């Protein structure tokens, strides 16, 4: 699976690269989600499509797309009580990276 890795604040996240339309400059009104942490600078935005149109998630850095073997991915168990946007984790080298669904992230903010 192709994942896009990015930072919000000091935390590394990943998302399904097929959800991403492009990376752009961030605008003041772009989406931030306190639960993911607040960006230090937030100069970049991940642009993605929702049923209502394009949405933008403000991020600090984009690390690029990497193909990750399916056996390195884990779905978030329903009993974890995680937010709807937290779809799983990726076992990336020595750390675990939270994988988020961009459309669900926008819905959480009531933007789409």
From Swiss-Prot:
UniProt feature coiled coil, ranges: none
GO biological process terms, semicolon-separated: chemotaxis; signal transduction
Listed InterPro entries: CheW-like_dom_sf (IPR036061), CheW-lke_dom (IPR002545)
Alphabetized UniProt keyword annotations: Chemotaxis, Transducer
UniProt KW NADP keyword: no
Function recorded in the entry: Necessary for proper aggregation of cells to form fruiting bodies. FRZ genes define a system of signal transduction analogous to the enterobacterial chemotaxis systems.
Name of the protein described by the UniProt record: Frizzy aggregation protein FrzB
Organism: Myxococcus xanthus
Phylogenetic lineage: Bacteria, Pseudomonadati, Myxococcota, Myxococcia, Myxococcales
């Amino acid at each position: 699976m192709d994942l896009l890795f990015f930072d919000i604040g000091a935390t590394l996240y990943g998302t399904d690269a097929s959800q991403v339309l492009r990376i752009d400059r961030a605008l003041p009104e772009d989406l931030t989600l306190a639960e993911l942490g607040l960006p230090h600078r937030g100069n970049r935005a991940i642009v993605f499509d929702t049923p209502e149109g394009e949405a933008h998630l403000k991020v600090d850095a984009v690390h690029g797309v990497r193909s990750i073997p399916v056996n390195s991915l884990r779905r978030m168990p329903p009993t974890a009580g995680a937010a709807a946007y937290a779809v799983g984790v990726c076992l990336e080298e020595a750390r675990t990276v939270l994988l988020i669904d961009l459309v669900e992230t926008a819905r959480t903010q009531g933007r789409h």
